[in-house]
Amino acid sequence: MDRTAAQLRIQELHREINRHNYLYYVEDRPEITDAEYDLLLRELQQLEKEFPDLVTADSPTQRVGAAPLDKFNQVSHRLPMLSLENAFNEGEMRDFDERIKRYLGLPMAKEIEYVCEPKMDGLAVELIYEEGSLTFGSTRGDGYVGEDVTQNLKTVKSIPLRLHCSPPPSLVEVRGEVYLGLAPFQKLNMDREEAGLPPFANPRNAAAGSLRQLDPRITARRPLSIFCYAPGLVEGYEFTSQSQMLATLPQWGLPVNPLIKKVAGIDAVLAYYREIGETRESLPYEIDGVVIKVDSFDLQRDLGEKTRSPRWAIAWKFPPRQAVTVVEDIVPQVGRTGVITPVAHLKPVEVSGVMVSRATLHNWEEMEKKDIRKGDTVVVERAGDVIPAVVKVMTEKRLEGAELLAVPAACPECGSEIVKIPGEVAIRCLGLTCPAQIRETIIHFASRHAMDIEGMGDKYVEQLLRLELVKTVADLYYLTKKDFMRFERMGDKLAENLLNAIEASKHRELSRFIFALGIRHVGEHTAKLLASAFGSVEHLEKATEEELLSIREVGPQVAQSVRTFFRNPANREVIERMFAAGVRPAVEEKRLGGRFTGKTFVFTGALTRFTRDDAKNMVENEGGHAAGSVSKKTDYVVAGAEAGSKLDKARQLGVNVLTEDEFLKMLEG
């Protein structure tokens, strides 16, 4: 291939790969397989290797991260990134609405058009595109001066390196919030604790810490996302309103929050705030309120700014997810990987509508740093599904004689030696037969998202261990009715149900089986990737590190962990014993010709005919995709009782709305 042909093909590959990146990371509806994507990327890499002078800054191959920096350079924003005034109740919101009308000389009966947006709890950044290419990115900083984090922002998969429009405006400055979703946050903290590193306190800190890494290669390994929400300077294109701007940005490849809504009047603003508050716990990311902006840019200019904040916008904060309680005890807890964690037993207190009686203290260094002691009065915080944590000690209320819990001299469960590996903050039990590790391993194996052995809860697992009926998960498949009849308060029918549940688990999907094995760093999503790539446990067991790394989203940490797991003879023996007992993981295959091929479904409200997990599986088994939010790409919304903002969004966009019965009829054909 000559240079001219290579240049044309490289440009074509840029467009194609960028489009598939957008579909995968922003729309969450891929059109090609990972293998097909990898072929495109490899072709581009090969062409760039042959013609290095054709490598451009906005090439998809340049996302992996540049060399580490010594420090971040400070940069000035051409337009200040002002902070927002806060409101904390309905009265303050009505005052805001009245102030705007008085300032503009409008009658109080006039309904102002507002745009309401979920207030993301992340890190504000500015992206600068020149002639369509991302050339610069910075943090908000103090609103006037931020830090140059261009190379790190280029690793965020949902940020396009080039705008999806032709011709692009000559200059586009856009502001957005970089965030880390709750599921990636929990996995990141789990990985850090297993690696002996201190966990992040919350998703916001994790996002900020990830984006401010001097080594962009570390940022590239963190699954950060972005929602854009405001323009800076724009040349070559004119926006007339906030709503028009938010409708245009996705056409350029820049993601915006799908829950944003344009409303008329303050009463509609109050209703939106209540709706978002009701759905807050089910969102896959953290929000801490709602941002309300006057929609018209002409009115925004008329209103102007105060010293630190615009007059035309306000942030209405949610009530804090914190409460004050007392630490009644601190108990060491052993996890399935041997990490020993101090756990605070609390006087029960309600936080965000949930009764909290325990909170993780993460590790001894963290506990000592926060100076948390038995009997202390503390502030606990609960964020989404994240385990409650102690965020502050009220030392002025400390009881005399309160002492820190000492690091245990031996494992509190089995008495084995404990170690603190250099460079780690975690302490670990080295006991190969530690009952706590075995218990947690079996509980994980039997859990709903793993082998789903119905009825096999914590109490039964503890009895199995106490009676020495199991030592590994493989032993579950050799249990008899006679074994279960040794349990306390066990009847014939219940024993038979447990045996039937164990039998039914023998043919679970391969991805569930891989997840159930408890391989470090392999969660549900990664297990699905591995199952899809290798098709059987035998093939996965023989996979080389190179083969593992060829899978999209599988990095060195996961690849090494998988190889380490299968190199362990004890692990292979457990798997062989399960296979000998009749365990045959089934390979799940998406039906390319299924009823729902190419269709995207969203489920909302209280479902009574099936669970959300069941619904997702039904859609995916028929070749479709189940998404978490409604957009113009959504084909169907299935609405249960008390459906809220997602149903409103569907009606606003003209998306087909189905009842549960109508969905089941579609499924049956």
UniProtKB/Swiss-Prot annotation:
Stored InterPro entries: BRCT_dom, BRCT_dom_sf, DisA/LigA_HHH, DNA_ligase, DNA_ligase_AS, DNA_ligase_CS, DNAligase_adenylation, DNAligase_N
Any single biological process term in GO: DNA repair
Keywords: DNA damage, DNA repair, DNA replication, Ligase, Magnesium, Manganese, Metal-binding, NAD, Zinc
Segments forming domain BRCT: 591-669
Enzyme Commission number: 6.5.1.2
Record's GO cellular component terms: cytosol
Residue positions binding Zn(2+): C411, C414, C429, C434
Catalytic reactions of this protein: NAD(+) + (deoxyribonucleotide)n-3'-hydroxyl + 5'-phospho-(deoxyribonucleotide)m = (deoxyribonucleotide)n+m + AMP + beta-nicotinamide D-nucleotide
Molecular function terms, GO-annotated: DNA binding; DNA ligase (NAD+) activity; metal ion binding
Enzyme class, broadest EC rank: ligase
Manganese listed as a keyword: yes
Binding locations of NAD(+): D34, A35, E36, Y37, D38, S83, L84, E117, R140, E177, K293, K317
HAMAP family, sorted: DNA_ligase_A (MF_01588)
Function comment: DNA ligase that catalyzes the formation of phosphodiester linkages between 5'-phosphoryl and 3'-hydroxyl groups in double-stranded DNA using NAD as a coenzyme and as the energy source for the reaction. It is essential for DNA replication and repair of damaged DNA.
NCBIfam families assigned to the protein according to its UniProt record, in alphabetical order: dnlj, PRK07956.1
Family: Belongs to the NAD-dependent DNA ligase family. LigA subfamily.
Alphabetized PANTHER family for the sequence: CHROMOSOME TRANSMISSION FIDELITY FACTOR 18, DNA LIGASE
Protein name: DNA ligase
Organism: Geotalea daltonii (strain DSM 22248 / JCM 15807 / FRC-32) (Geobacter daltonii)
